[in-house]
Regions:
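Central regulatory/effector-binding core of bacterial HTH transcription factors
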Residues: 89-151
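Alpha-helical linker/hinge and terminal dimerization helices associated
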Residues: 42-43, 64-86
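Acidic, Gly/Pro-rich loop/turn segments at junctions of secondary structure
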Residues: 125-180, 231
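A short LG(V/I)-centered, amphipathic sequence patch enriched
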Residues: 40-59, 76
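A late-sequence structural motif
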Residues: 244-294
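Hydrophobic hinge/microswitch elements
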Residues: 127-128, 146, 199-250
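Short helix-boundary/capping micro-motifs
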Residues: 10-28
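Secondary-structure junction motif
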Residues: 177-205, 209-211, 266, 280
Length: 295
């Protein structure tokens, strides 16, 4: 089977059309069409319905989809490991949302690299949607992300919920009524509980969908924002930021998601997860917890 054609098949499904697949693969649409035709001829089945509204799976395509991610993932692993330098026996591709790198992401990466000297590691940043797509297609072995749902041939490991605390560049900032309040979008459940608690606070003038961006802005400008504790803690420790007293502490679910192949292959994975869970135990002694999201 032509692995390039199979990867193209997966990219068509990921993007929803042959045109977008061509853009993502940086090839012409005719090349994408030719690769798909090659795969269909090899299998003797039509795999994708080509429609103006987009590409959809045929029954045969749905059956192939059960195996395609595993096939491409195994090939990628074989390719990576056969090219490893002497002394390295395996490779792990890891992905993490940027807002989680400072806590669970970095803790996992450090554990793997420090305890497994024969392991080659690569790290990749992406949105939650990108990461789940990449692990589904075999491009990644393990991811740390928010609000994950395990698909077939994947195992989900819940991690301690991420604490979201109200931080400010000033002491004694009001909980409600700060004209420089920055709204950070931490997901649908957070938006719901935030709206319940701050129902009479009005609409924030500044909005970010990245806690990292909000942090960088807050370090250079007056204001307040809900940030993940793991991200804000270094700046709290050196008094560059301050926790707003008595503000509710929200929570957001996060998880480590691994392909079943990775679970079987990396015998140290559960120890790494236990290390993260121990390192990120709830810190109720540092701030009151009055509101919750994703619990």
């Amino acid at each position: 089977m032509n692995l390039t054609s199979l990867q193209t098949f997966l990219t068509i499904l990921e993007t929803g059309s042959l045109v977008r697949a061509a853009d993502k693969l940086n090839v012409t649409q005719s090349t994408v069409t030719a690769r798909l035709k090659t795969l269909e001829e090899e299998l003797g089945q039509v795999l994708i319905n080509r429609q103006k509204s987009g590409a959809t799976l045929t029954p045969a395509g749905a059956k192939l989809m059960r195996y395609a991610p595993a096939i491409t993932g195994l090939w990628r692993q074989a390719k990576n490991e056969t090219g490893l330098p002497a002394g390295l026996t395996s490779a792990c591709s890891f992905g993490c949302e940027r807002d989680l790198w400072h806590g669970a992401g970095r803790a996992f990466f450090h554990y793997a690299t420090s305890t497994q000297p024969e392991l080659a590691m690569s790290a990749r940043q992406g949105s939650g949607r990108d990461l789940t797509d990449w692990i589904a297609t075999g491009s990644l072995d393990i991811i740390v992300t928010f609000d994950a749902v395990a698909r077939a041939s994947q195992t989900l490991y819940p991690l301690p919920a991420e604490e979201l605390i109200l931080c400010s560049d000033r002491r004694n900032t009001p909980i409600i009524g700060d004209p420089n309040y920055i709204f950070v979008d931490h997901g649908a459940e957070y938006r719901r509980v935030h709206a319940e608690f701050y129902h009479d606070a009005g609409i924030a003038r500044l909005n970010f969908d990245s806690a990292w961006w909000a942090l960088q802005y807050l370090l250079e400008n007056p204001g307040s924002a809900y940030l993940p504790r793991s991200l804000a803690q270094p700046y709290l420790d050196k008094a560059a930021l301050f926790i707003v007293p008595d503000a509710p502490v929200f929570h957001r679910k996060k998880s480590l998601l691994a392909s079943d192949q990775a679970v079987e292959k990396f015998h140290w994975l559960e120890k790494a997860i236990a290390q993260i869970q121990s390192h990120e135990r709830p810190q109720h002694d540092r701030a009151p917890s009055q509101g919750q999201a994703g619990q």
